[in-house]
From Swiss-Prot:
Species: Synechococcus sp. (strain CC9311)
Record SUPFAM superfamilies: PRC-barrel domain, Translation proteins
Family membership noted in the UniProt record: Belongs to the RimM family.
ATP-binding recorded as keyword: no
Database matches in InterPro entries: PRC_barrel-like_sf (IPR011033), PRC_RimM (IPR056792), RimM (IPR011961), RimM_N (IPR002676), RimM_N_sf (IPR036976), Transl_B-barrel_sf (IPR009000)
Known role: An accessory protein needed during the final step in the assembly of 30S ribosomal subunit, possibly for assembly of the head region. Essential for efficient processing of 16S rRNA. May be needed both before and after RbfA during the maturation of 16S rRNA. It has affinity for free ribosomal 30S subunits but not for 70S ribosomes.
GO cellular component: cytoplasm; ribosome
UniProt KW Cell membrane keyword: no
Encoding gene (name): rimM
GO molecular function: ribosome binding
Protein name: Ribosome maturation factor RimM
């Protein structure tokens, strides 16, 4: 990682200027490749060469150069190669870092579409009620995305982000509707 300054349009200390798109979860092989767990539905962020930023917990983002990337067959993980990371030890030192892009680089979406990360912070409501039961606190990407919802009771539950369970998302109004099967919110 180099300490090259961030783009002038992004404040390295403001989380609002950055969009987390993945996490480095492990070294791959002996030549410095890294496994990346994506938090983005745009694979070009992991396969097209160019500038990205890495952020270790409690640190400012640091600029890195993505040289190449590929998706592992049959998995949601990517393998990426970063400039200056040439061996397993230097790759292992980056495990746990969050991969960022400037928030201004979000792809344009069609009307009615939204970025999954925009769901964090929305109120969760049950069908037939205007009262919130909790707030979306995190998004867990995988085969099926999961919403982590902190209930008003203080308990945290994971809810599959599928249309049958989350049939309505109202970003502008700040809420989403849940129609969970019996017992899901009690797990």
């Amino acid at each position: 990682m180099t300490s090259t300054p961030s783009p002038s349009t992004a404040d390295p200390n403001s989380t609002n200027d950055w969009l987390p798109v993945g996490t480095l979860v492990g070294a791959q092989g002996l030549k410095g490749e890294l496994r990346l767990n994506p938090a983005s539905d745009f694979p070009e962020r992991f396969t097209e060469p160019g500038t990205r930023w890495l952020q270790a917990k409690g640190s400012a983002p640091k600029e890195v150069e993505l040289l190449e990337g590929r998706q592992l067959p049959g998995k949601s993980l990517y393998v990426v190669r970063l400039k200056g990371v040439n061996n397993r030890a230097s790759a292992e030192a980056l495990v746990g870092c969050t991969v960022l892009v400037p928030a201004k680089d979000r792809p344009e979406l069609a009307e009615g579409e939204f970025h999954l990360l925009d769901l964090v912070g929305l109120e969760a409501r049950l069908a037939g009620s205007d009262e919130p039961i909790g707030t979306v606190s995190n998004l867990i990407s995988g085969g099926n995305d999961l919403l982590e919802i902190k209930l008003n009771s203080g308990k945290t539950v994971l809810v599959p982000f599928v249309e049958a369970i989350v049939p309505d998302v109202q970003l502008e109004e700040g809420w989403l509707l849940l129609t969970p099967p019996p017992g899901l919110l009690e797990l």
